Amino acid sequence: MSGGMVLVDVSGKASTVMTTKGDIVTFSSSRVRKAVGSNSQFLVCDSTDADGNKYDYNTTSFVIACSDETSDLEVGDDKAQIQLPFQFELTAISANVNVASTGADINIQVQEDNVNIMSGVGITIDATETSSLTSATLPTITDSTLASGSIISVDLDQIGSGDTGKGLKINLIGYRIV
């Protein structure tokens, strides 16, 4: 001990494990190198991983209310708009209503700066159902990287022919790109 400090010789320990900028040393039954994660990932504890931690994305979502909860839905463009506060990687998209349509499906298209971000009809909520998660046709995202400051708008392209549906919400799921 020298001046209140404990000196420990660790020469050759961590440097033999780490090979790349950003590497960390972790432990399972021995010291192991955990390679640096990808951009936008962060380190989390995970008891199912051999060394107890892994890199993952911090998932977040935007929920866009496209109507009130009690009025019938109506076909039209720009039913709701938001401006993204940061660059966003879209990994999933879904929609739900609190009152199901009858007679026809609900079809919804989402746009980034007036350009569709999904192929085909976009999101479908099947007639008599309240969620797109159970739809026979799931949406295919064609533009997953959404720019900071872009305007996200929702178009309602088809509604039920009996009950039109009520209380439409869109869920944009993904992570912030840093």
For each of these PLM feature ranges, what is it?
Residues 1-178:
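Extracellular repetitive beta-rich solenoid segments
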